[in-house]
Regions:
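Internal, well-folded beta-alpha domain core
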Residues: 74-242
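Hydrophobic, proline/glycine-rich low-complexity stretches
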Residues: 1-59, 194, 202, 206-242
Length: 242
């Protein structure tokens, strides 16, 4: 299937991105075949990301009644894959949280992604050039949250910075239960980011993400920022011949 075909078009906005250094060994069982864990200056990162999904359209044109605007919170890490002379830098999702069952079901069926649906809330507030964004979800009877506050104006990440590394991975990879790997392209312009002056993440990480992650969030994130976001296109997936 050609990557030129768009499966889903939307806007991703107000992306809270909290980034934690981890031992790459904890990611081993999540790494899809044909990919390898990516690193930045010798360190491996996982990211907790909360954001708004807005104006969602199937095939780039078909509006989805009652499902066009919603929030998502995910835990992801970064991989790379060689395609000929090209190195494709991508994202693997450990878990993705959305508020509607239909969205989770479509994503699981089409991409094999690890979606769950639970009640969610958000607070977005702007003050001057700054921004505060918080995303909350209810899991097993308790509310959890990811939050960041920024007081400065957003700027494009510096070339070669960690912020650029985190935001500019334009491929997604999923390991299917049958051992195959799914690859898909995500298209968007570079995002401006606010550097966070404060951040907060609360979750039962071991239960939600797996025992590998229960100790990953005891320390503050290595970096925290809010990405402005943009229009995005998620292209049809393909199964890799490995």
């Amino acid at each position: 299937m050609e990557f030129g075909r768009i499966f889903l078009a939307a806007e991703w906005r107000n992306l809270v991105m909290l980034n934690y250094r981890v031992d790459p060994g904890i990611l081993e069982r999540f790494v899809p075949r044909g990919t390898a864990v990516d690193s930045f200056q010798g360190s491996t990162y996982i990211s907790v990301v909360g954001f708004q999904f807005l104006r969602t359209r199937l095939f780039g044109r078909l509006a989805i009644p009652f499902h066009a605007n919603f929030d998502e919170v995910n835990l992801r890490f970064y991989v790379r894959r060689k395609e000929g002379e090209e190195t494709r830098r991508g994202v693997v999702f450990v878990k993705e949280i959305v508020p509607r069952r239909a969205i989770a079901a479509v994503a699981r069926f089409s991409y094999g992604e690890k979606y769950v649906s639970v009640p969610m809330r958000r607070v977005i507030s702007a003050e001057g050039a700054g921004l505060t964004a918080e995303y909350r979800w209810k899991f097993r009877g308790r509310w959890y949250a990811v939050r960041a506050e920024a007081t400065n104006a957003p700027i494009l990440p510096a070339e070669g910075s960690l912020e650029q590394f985190i935001t500019e991975h334009y491929w997604g990879y999923t390991g299917r239960r049958d051992g195959q790997t799914v690859e898909y392209r995500v298209s968007h312009v570079p995002w401006r980011v606010w550097s966070a002056s404060k951040s907060h993440f609360e979750s039962d990480a071991g239960t939600l993400y797996g025992p590998e992650f229960k100790d990953c969030f005891h320390q503050p994130p290595a970096s925290a920022f809010i990405a402005e976001g943009s229009a995005v296109s998620v292209h049809f997936p393909r199964r890799l011949a490995l």
